[in-house]
Amino acid sequence: MSQASSSPGEGPSSEAAAISEAEAASGSFGRLHCQVLRLITNVEGGSLEAGRLRLLDLRTNIEVSRPSVLCCFQENKSPHDTVDLTDLNIKGRCVVGEQDRLLVDLNNFGPRRLTPGSENNTVSVLAFALPLDRVPVSGLHLFQSQRRGGEENRPRMEARAIIRRTAHHWAVRLTVTPNWRRRTDSSLEAGQIFVSQFAFRAGAIPLTLVDALEQLACSDPNTYIHKTETDERGQWIMLFLHHDSPHPPTSVFLHFSVYTHRAEVVARHNPYPHLRRLPDNGFQLLIPKSFTLTRIHPEYIVQIQNAFETNQTHDTIFFPENIPGVSIEAGPLPDRVRITLRVTLTGDQAVHLEHRQPLGRIHFFRRGFWTLTPGKPDKIKRPQVQLRAGLFPRSNVMRGAVSEFLPQSPGLPPTEEEEEEEEEDDEDDLSSTPTPTPLSEAMFAGFEEASGDEDSDTQAGLSPALILTGQRRRSGNNGALTLVIPSWHVFASLDDLVPLTVSVQHAALRPTSYLRSDMDGDVRTAADISSTLRSVPAPRPSPISTASTSSTPRSRPRI
């Protein structure tokens, strides 16, 4: 793109030429179509002290034609770059929807103040969209227990149930007098939970065919079914109840249905109350206990006493909310491992997060969308401030040339394998099998056969221009670019991403701004774009602490 130049001796004609050139540039940047957007921007519109945080407005909007996860990560320009914190560090942004304005946290971890005219004030980000296909999930799965000692170990408490067959499920109504036991749990707001368990005869319900249960009604609003199991002989259904108020009821009426679901993903326990089901794919994660992040206590670990099991058919990914001044772990969640997320303060002021405040979303991606990077032991999650993305040739990725994460400090949290879930229900000594036969065998084969149809459905409703952008197959071409997320040890094909429609605001353009196209238009680069700094909005007031008034710059957070 030609650059506009002027000299003191030139008259109004040169100014008119510059204006017309700016208008032409605005038109070319107004509506771009691509799979991945690379945005190279110069930080302007204010200064940023060393060790401080401000919001960076990239003045760019992205849109997609279907609900997706819209991501904006700092770019790794070389396969040898680590995901350590940089002097100018951008926190990864993830938004679920169909459009987003790119507004990210910018931390100055360098030793010097950043001003508009200073050197090294250029940052580069990659924006892309991840598809959200419909994934059925069983909230209350009927696990088959393996009891020690046989029938005599069945729970002593029994309940009489009224069972009726309907068109598509078995309706069960029963009244039980629970034998409540109090159990302490520091991860909950109340610090305790009341638990009870009982069993009822399945009667005519074919326990070898049904695999799911749905609670329809309960006489007490604070009581819910936490877990369900069947015995080895297929004669009993066991229910584990939880009550989260200080005064549990003496009698509980339950109405629920038992049916055959054969879902591709199951939850180990009832998602309620800290996982809110989303319509087609995933759950919204709610904070189980309020907490405050301060400069004295900058970290907190959120624990959800639940896990998911996919039988290797899906990857479970957690995408955190965009809370200014807070970095939350994001990335893959391993199967059958309790959900633990480290939350870290990265800003200057204390931040208070309320009980049941949304912390992020959990979504599921079909097997094969994410590929483990060669040479890496497993997929991992990392804090938002360490989310990086890169575009590298497939040959380099398959050769294992992408650098591994280098720890910033020796005090790292334990790995997920060390936190393998130990069935936290102390009320029983049961061990559950992963899944019944209908899910582990019949459903897996059906999923494999339907994968081709799901790929074709992802193009439905797209404009011809967007379809052409995403249909250029590059299989077998080792020089083709792939999207690598080194923070998670994964990479993905550009063809599997949702096409983007990008518009850069006219105010962000400079006379030297230019566009570049790679991979037949699948990758568009908008370079020399102007971005502005904004103040961080005041955090939610904390009931136990106030905003820090110290003038000491904040050091790099321990991650």
Curated annotation (Swiss-Prot):
**One GO CC annotation:** host cell nucleus
GO BP annotation list: DNA-templated viral transcription; symbiont-mediated perturbation of host cell cycle G1/S transition checkpoint; symbiont-mediated suppression of host innate immune response
Q: Which InterPro entries match?
A: Herpes_UL82/UL83
Q: How is it modified after translation?
A: S-nitrosylation limits ability to undermine the cGAS/STING antiviral pathway.
Q: Where is the composition biased (Acidic residues)?
A: 415-430
Give positions of region: Disordered.
404-440, 530-559
Residue numbers bearing the Phosphothreonine modification: T223
Give the main localization category: virion
Where in this protein does the record say S-nitrosocysteine is found? C218
| Localization per Swiss-Prot or TrEMBL | Virion tegument; Host nucleus; Host endoplasmic reticulum
Q: Where is the composition biased (Low complexity)?
A: 431-440, 543-559
Mark the transmembrane ranges: none
Into which family does the record put it?
A: Belongs to the herpesviridae pp71 family.
Quote the function comment for this protein.
Stimulates viral immediate-early (IE) transcription. Plays a role in the inhibition of the host innate repsonse by targeting STING1 and thus the cGAS-STING pathway. Also counteracts host DAXX-mediated repression of viral transcription. Displaces a DAXX-binding protein, ATRX, from nuclear domain 10 sites (ND10) shortly after infection. Increases the basal level of SUMOylated DAXX in infected cells. Stimulates quiescent cells to re-enter the cell cycle, proceed through G1 and enter the S phase.
- What's the subunit arrangement here? Interacts with the host protein DAXX; this interaction takes place at ND10 and induces the reversal of DAXX-mediated repression of viral transcription. Interacts with UL35. Interacts with host TMEM173/STING1; this interaction inhibits the cGAS/STING pathway. Interacts with host RB1; this interaction mediates RB1 proteasomal degradation.
Stated name of the protein = Protein pp71
Organism of origin is: Human cytomegalovirus (strain AD169)
**What does the record give as the organism's lineage?**
Viruses, Duplodnaviria, Heunggongvirae, Peploviricota, Herviviricetes
UniProt gene name? UL82
